[in-house]
Design a protein with these regions (language model features):
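Charged phosphate-binding loop/patch that engages nucleotide di/tri-phosphates or the phosphate backbone
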Residues: 118-139
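Residue-level signal for short segments within beta-strands and strand-turn junctions
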Residues: 12-14, 22, 85-86, 105
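Unchanged
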Residues: 40-122
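Conserved N-terminal beta-strand and adjoining loop/helix that marks the start
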Residues: 1-20, 40
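Conserved Nudix-box catalytic region and its N-terminal flanking loop in Nudix hydrolases
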Residues: 17-53, 57
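A generic fold-level signal
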Residues: 3-5, 13, 29, 76, ...
Length: 139
């Protein structure tokens, strides 16, 4: 059985920092919550392809591939998270999609979670899962 995901999200990472973004909120009040770049999976599109496309559209970033971190639930839907290393600065992004981007370490993401400033609430868990995957790959 094929799992149907609503969105594909991506953790860009470098050393001990992870990229989060504040998405535009035209349809509701701006609550300035930080989340992962990504978005809707189009009809007929593989989730990993959607993740790569969303990186190009939102951050003007091209990565050769992504690794799957796992599925996460938000508002009664499943969302799949991928990850890719990124070592360059991101100086520009689509300001029709995103308000702000920033690199955060795990402690800062934990603070955002305690302040209820994470979009879906599971971003920290996704980062921690990625760290375990990276650690296992090194062993």
């Amino acid at each position: 059985m094929t799992v149907r995901y609503k969105t594909a999200r991506v953790i860009l990472y470098r050393e001990d920092r992870f990229l989060l973004a504040v998405h535009q909120s035209f349809w509701r009040t701006r609550d300035r919550r930080w989340g992962l770049p990504g978005g809707q999976i189009e009809r007929g599109e593989a989730p990993a392809e959607a993740a790569l496309r969303e990186l190009r559209e939102e951050l003007y970033v091209r990565v050769p591939s992504v690794i799957e971190v796992g599925p996460f639930s938000y508002k009664s839907a499943l969302h799949v998270v991928y990850a890719a290393p990124w070592h360059e600065e991101i100086r520009d992004f689509d300001d029709m999609e995103l308000d702000e981007i920033g690199w955060f370490d795990e402690a800062a993401i934990l603070s955002l979670k305690h302040e209820r400033r994470l979009h879906a609430g599971w971003e920290l868990e996704a980062v921690q899962t990625l760290r375990r995957l990276i650690g296992a790959a090194r062993d």
